[in-house]
Amino acid sequence: MVQIRCINNGLTKQFTPGVNLQEVYDAFALNMPYGVVSARVNNKVEGLSFKVYNHKDVEFLDITSDSGMRTYVRSLFFVLTKAIDDLYPDGEVIIEHPISKGYFCNLRIGRPVTSADVDSIKLHMQEIIAADMPIRRINCTTDEAITTFDCAGRTDVTTLLSTTGKLYSFYYKLDGKVDFF
């Protein structure tokens, strides 16, 4: 058994090795009004699918923490890129920089973007979220990740991955859409 101490409430519980953080969160029955988005495990932020094999201190994070908000925003960016891929297969979105409590994005769809386009994207994002599609973290060899992104036409990511020098990498997948954050 592994011992997990929850920083949020100070309680410690025993779990079977290999338990994921979502299961740990459920077992502690925390009342987080904004929902949990990630967790700090021994001071390192991890996703809720992270599996625990040794004793750990865990602090669950929601959007009221800086790290939790960054996780939430990255998830929304992923949903945005999925919506644009679905609606405009040849389109491209470039997420640039924070500005005025939001982010500046450059959307290229081969013509000027209209308010109807924005409404369509917003509606499709809401549909993706309502469908409760899981965002999966895929761990694999870096060569496999490079092949995956090469097939997706993401030379920017293949270049980045080929220069890391790491044997293993990870990427995220949402209903067939792959991305790297």
Task: Outline where the language-model segments fall.
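Non-catalytic interaction/regulatory segments
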Residues: 99, 108-181
